[in-house]
Amino acid sequence: MEQKNQITEGVIWKQLLIFFFPIVIGTFFQQVYNTADSIVVGRFVGKEALAAVSGSVNQIVTLIVEVFVGLTSGASVIIAQFYGAKDHKNLNRTLHTAYAFAIVTGAIVGLIGFWITEKVLIAMKTPSELMADSVIYLHIYFCGMIFNIVYNMGASILRAVGDSRRPLYVLIMTCGLNIFFDIMLVVFLKMGVMGVAIATVSCQGISACMVTWILIKGNSLFRLKIREIRFYMASLQSVLRIGIPVALEATMYTIANLIIQIFVNGLGTDTVAAWGTFAKIDAIYWMVVNSFGIAITTFVGQNYGAGKIQRMRKSVKVCLLMSYGAAILVSAALYGFAEPLYRLFTTDSNVVRIGADMMHFLLPSYFMYVVIGILSGALRGAGRVLVPMLLTCGGVCLIRIAWMFGVFPVYSGIKTIMLSYPVSWGITAVLFIIYYFKKFPKTEEQILQ
């Protein structure tokens, strides 16, 4: 028991790193898992197939994943708080409610998504030459949606109780399988985009089964029992109270990016391929910063539940410093190796040139996001989710949307699109700093407010 709760006891920087590294390594393998599709189709099928899986499809998949990662964070925060408070009864009720929620929503979203795929792609002005492959990929993806949501829920629960290692082991194994399946189905069996979609969904199914098995075999404090998977209304309300604002935040974020993708789609196939591939490459940066965000959410949640307010506040400061150091190193490395990284995905010289220019333009501004990622994670762990959601929706999403409809028609071009990112990050970062200093708990009495 003591070993599993070092988050509330150990040296902060050391425990943050112990918790962070499995998350960031796991996120790296998740990115490899996703990127393998693009590399295989880009090099063995063609740039049209690369654009199909990297453009509108990537934005739609990201929207769905981000929404449900947001909802799973509701379960994660509540479970972390109950675990820190050693309230095992409510911990287990939340665990079983979360799994019931994942199964039901996975089935519903899969059915709806399959039905509206083509309509959404048309609404996004997906180029006609990319439509067939995009529809095939998304239809197969939606057939396996339940696996995706169950895995994310299970992994989120494990991290909430301080176990960031076993989700990593699952990802490493399924990542290797995904690459193997990609090569077999695309390179040897010539199945194209259908092959990478089948490979992805198959591995998501394996991931979901493995993380569920881990929870079934877990210790008695938070063991999943299949017969007890049901909705406990009080637990569901607590999960949704945290999860819905986070999911709405993620939804608005991705809707803004979907709108941006529509404008990018009008700039030609090469730009679409470069933009979509950029999202694969710079994910290396986001996985580092967001892993610190996940870590601080769990740290704050458990210490909040245990009533250790000063330790909770100190962990935020330590996490910010560590995040900035890592963010600067990663963005500098990506900047320096922009062209070689693009050549991993495609041999088309024009796509490489456009993509490298994108990276050189945007990467110097990425440091501004660190404050947003860490402070929003900390506030979430303390149960403050509504205002951070409004800050993100207004400061990031609405500004980007207004920018695209107000500025882009006057100064059209990819650089105008890219400029919306640093502008929105800068404004939102200032808003988060102000709110954090005003509302983040300073005393135990504020926990009860």
Where are these regions (language model features)?
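Helix-terminus/linker motif at the lipid-water interface of multi-pass membrane proteins
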Residues: 28, 32-51, 121-128, 184-191, ...
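Small-residue-rich hydrophobic transmembrane alpha-helices
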Residues: 50-111, 148-167, 275-338, 369-392
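Short runs within selected transmembrane alpha-helices of multi-pass transporters and secretion channels
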Residues: 72, 141-159, 167-178, 196-211, ...
